[in-house]
Each structure stands twice: as structure tokens, then as C-alpha cells.
Amino acid sequence: QSLIETGLKQNTDLLSAAQNVKAAEASLMSARLAYAPSLGLSPQGTISSFDKNAATKTYSLPVTASWQVDLFGQLLNSKRNAQVTLKQMKAYRQAVQTQVVSNIANMYYTLMMLDRQLEITKATAEILKKNAETMEAMKDAAMYSINSAGVEQSKAAYAQVLASIPDIEQSIRETENALSTLLGEAPHAIKRGELEAQVLPTELSAGVPIQLLSNRPDVKAAEMSLASCYYNTNSARAAFYPQITLSGSAGWT
């Protein structure tokens, strides 16, 4: 549980997805503000003097305002596109979060499985070593018709099992490094329990209704991506039509 909490806070892919959500929120705010009139202020001031007379100060404050009439739906489609893009980014973030949790749990149980495999392999190697030593002693004592072929075969079995231990240890290190990267940390040893101590569910679900598939974040993201393409197309079509802008200006001098 602590590893999952760490991954949800520090995983780089999840942090990137969160930044994408913030960018989509900013784009939606910009699309909403496009409906509001735009105002412009350009205050000016001059000081002039002729023939050593008193200086004359002149001030002006022109104000301009313009408002685009969304007659053909360009602004509307841009806003809707921003809305579905925000939903898409949120669904993508949820999908990344689900994947991060799944990968952390999978690697954690893989490490415990490798630990158990290493323990069994070392115990097996010890048994085969004692077996080879016993057969060697029996051959030297000429007991039970033990020949050299049998002794060499037992030694070969021991050597084969012994040679597999470094491979398992390498797999453990690689899995720890991959899990550390997933947690957003430098490679280090992962503290973990034993496989036998884990409590697994006794009842497994047979499946989910097909209606619930629409709740999957990746399905939602794909749906919102399709909607975004639709609104982008409508906005591009509206751009072919003339834009109607109402503008006005006022000033004070």
C-alpha cells in the first residue's frame, strides 16, 4: 500500500498527465473568455513648450472595444472542443493512475515470487550438492555398484541448478530497478514481505456487464478524442465563413 501511495505521488507519467489536465483547464477558460468583448486602453500624454513659455500638458485616453458575433458557431465549437479535451485528459490521467497501480502491484508480487524461487533454488542446490558428495563417497567405498557416470551426472545436476542462481538474482535486481523507476525514485532495494504471508481473495469475479465497459478510462478517453475531432472539424468549417465583429471606440482628451 505504501509503494502504491508513493507511486501515485511521484510517478513521472502521472505527474505529466496531471499537468495535461491543468493545460486543458486553461484552454477551456480561454475558450470561454472568447465570448466576452475585448477592451483596449492606450493612455498617452505629451508635454510641449514654445519660446520659453509655460509647458503645456496634454493627456488622452482612447478606449476601444470589439465583440465577435458567433454567427456560424466557431466560438461555440471551440469551447465544446475544449470541454471534451478536458474530459479526455482527466480520463487519460485516470487510465495512467490505474496502470501505475497495476504495475506496482504486479512488480511487488513478482519480487516476492522471485525471492521464493531463489530460496527454493538454493535449497535444491544444497540437496544436490550433498547428494553428489554422498554418491562420490559411496563410489569410493564401492557400495551399491555406484559408477563414475552416476557421480558425474549428479555433479552436473548440481552445477546446472547452481548456475541458475545468478540469473534469478539478476532478475530480482532488474525488477527492483524497474519498480524504483515506476515510483519516481533512484534504483534501490525494495522492502517487501514473504509470498506465503500475503492474503489473497478467495472469491473472484466472473466478469462485469458489458455496460460497465463505458466506465473504463481508456474507453472514455477514446470517446472524448472522437468528440474533439468532431468539434475541431466544425470549427474549421466555420472558419470558411466571414467573421462579424462589432467594434466601438471612445476617448477623453
Regions found by a protein language model. Name each.
Residues 1:
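Mature N-terminal segment immediately following signal peptide/propeptide cleavage
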Residues 75, 147, 215:
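Short, conserved glycine- and acidic-residue-centered signature motifs
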Residues 71-80:
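Short, polar/flexible loop-turn hinges at active-site or ligand-entry regions and domain interfaces
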Residues 5-70, 102, 174-190, 196, ...:
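A small-residue-enriched
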Residues 84, 91-208:
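Periplasmic alpha-helical coiled-coil/stalk elements that build and connect Gram-negative outer-membrane
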